[in-house]
Amino acid sequence: RLPPGIAAVTAERGRGKSALAGMLLRQLGGEAIVTAPTRSAVEVLASFAGETLRFMAPDALLASKEKAAWLIVDEAAAIPAPLLRQLVSRFPRTLLTTTVQGYEGTGRGFLLKFCASLPHLQSFTLSAPIRWAAGCPLESAISQLLIFNDEAFRDAPMGEIALEAVNQSCWQTQPALPEAMYQLLSGAHYRTSPLDLRRMMDAPGQAFRCARAGGAVAGAL
């Protein structure tokens, strides 16, 4: 049992951090409140927690006088820092989870900025997958197919900006360009899903614009 304080768990997308939080919640019984940017964001957590889930939206929780031994915040980096700071101050023990990919991958900055300001924070990284066996080739294949990697956009492209129209046919003729656009959009938008990738590939009525700087994708619309 963790002593009073705040713990943060980071992991790559799909590694199982929400499942891990759900397992903890099942053990805690009714001793915890769960919050997240949206109710749908805790579906995986809820499937592992069983009937013990007590969810409240962040603003509703802050406005209430609810008390619990634990506060579990899933996708914590997607909650505004001032609101999150008020929430964690209300509970004796808080577990924060965030991914290091996609929009919620602001979790990298979340750890450096928000968590760095918290005294006695215990930080953990979930490296062993819960959904997969370690080194499972299926995980690597799915990550590649669904374009989960957004590491290319850690540094902003430099140079003169050039705008161009991009057609859906580029997925067949020049796939690297729409892939880079999707990676950028995924990293900049909250809860991008594989359905968004499918729509970008084949949904009718789509129009795309790309901004390039020094040959690299700097913007996408």
Residue ranges and their predicted role:
Residues 2-7, 206-207:
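Pre-Walker A (Motif I) flank of P-loop NTPase domains
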Residues 20, 24:
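Hydrophobic positions on the alpha1 helix immediately C-terminal to the Walker A/P-loop
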Residues 7-8, 30-42:
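Conserved RecA-like ASCE P-loop NTPase motor core of nucleic-acid helicases/translocases
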Residues 115-154:
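Conserved coupling/interface region of RecA-like P-loop/ASCE motor cores
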Residues 17:
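Conserved lysine of the Walker
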Residues 51-89:
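Conserved RecA-like ASCE ATPase "motif II neighborhood" in helicase/translocase motors
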Residues 164-220:
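Conserved helicase/translocase motor-coupling segment
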Residues 81-121:
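Signature of the SF2 helicase/ATPase Hel1-core->accessory helical subdomain module
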